[in-house]
Amino acid sequence: MKKIYLDDVRTPLDTEWIVVRNYSEFVTKVQDIGLNNISEISLDHDLGDTAMDEYFNNVQPNYTLNYDNIQEKTGYDCAKWLVEHYYQLNPPVDVPRLIMKKSEFKFPKITTHSANPIGASNITGYINNFLFNEAREQNCVRVKIAHV
């Protein structure tokens, strides 16, 4: 099983991570490896200069985040794509939640290592809502991963 680390700047010390630097590389790598062959994905939120500008100009001083100011796709976009990709591979079926809990569910563990608290919260909230709707444990959290 593979592990994917999305970050435009940092590189994890643990060499088991496959590092991707942007949304495009992320989508390509997940499709190449296959969602069922990935055990863990850690997402940064701010990918690129305009995302970092938004972080320093609005998030840090004002605790607000305006996605209209960000030109690049973010880790949040990657989280949304993951859920959409999962449903493309596993079309939703109308079954009772008890049966859903017992059925096989293959989705990697998702974490975020973003320094941006609002972006990290958006990622964890989105993934945990998806897991809740699939009758699964809501285990997406913000983590620290040692990096160079």
Question: Which residue ranges define each predicted feature?
Answer:
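Catalytic phosphate/metal-binding cores of nucleic-acid and nucleotide-processing enzymes, i.e., regions
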Residues: 1-148
